[in-house]
């Protein structure tokens, strides 16, 4: 039997038993959808194949996609918002790197030194994930494809997007107005 230790979105540590290794990613997805995380972000961020970026299942690491009011796609992980950045290929005498997509944010004073990366000047940032090179891994993709998964991706052309149920706001029942000479009841 395997065990995974998660940190809930409220900071509690929870150990979950996994019957078989074939269920490991399913368990991570389940608790990741709740915002629970396991482990720490590695220095430089998680490394994934670039072919997985379009339909990556962010719940595997306890993250979720979110679209800002300005329309910018972000990834939320442990209360921090990470921006999508496209990095050009590097081809120099000393370094050759293929193009990549990185999700990162500006570093904060509370971030441990080992996760901070230097940029131009005095700017530091923290990377959540980088998608570069490699061969596609189906196990990292959203199960059942990206369409209609709530991860912010459109349905493929020629296929209708699944309708997303709309949440209805709960409204308190209207209270009758207080009549003159009548005292209002204390709510507790």
UniProtKB/Swiss-Prot annotation:
Outcome of mutating residue 94 to A: Reduced ssDNA-binding
Outcome of mutating residue 51 to A: Forms pentamers but not higher-ordered structures; binds ssDNA normally
GO biological process: cellular response to desiccation; cellular response to gamma radiation; DNA repair; double-strand break repair via single-strand annealing
Top-rank taxon: Bacteria
Function: ssDNA-binding protein that contributes to the ionizing radiation resistance of D.radiodurans. Plays a role in DNA repair and genome reconstitution in a RecA-independent process. Required for recovery from severe genomic fragmentation as a result of exposure to severe levels of ionizing radiation. Binds ssDNA but not dsDNA. Stimulates annealing of complementary ssDNA. Does not complement an ssb disruption.
Subunit structure: Homopentamer arranged in a ring-structure; DNA binds between subunits and along the top of the ring. The pentamers self-associate to coat ssDNA in higher-ordered structures; oligomerization facilitates the assembly of extended nucleoprotein complexes. Self-assembly does not however require ssDNA-binding. Interacts with SSB.
Protein name: Single-stranded DNA-binding protein DdrB
Lineage: Bacteria, Thermotogati, Deinococcota, Deinococci, Deinococcales
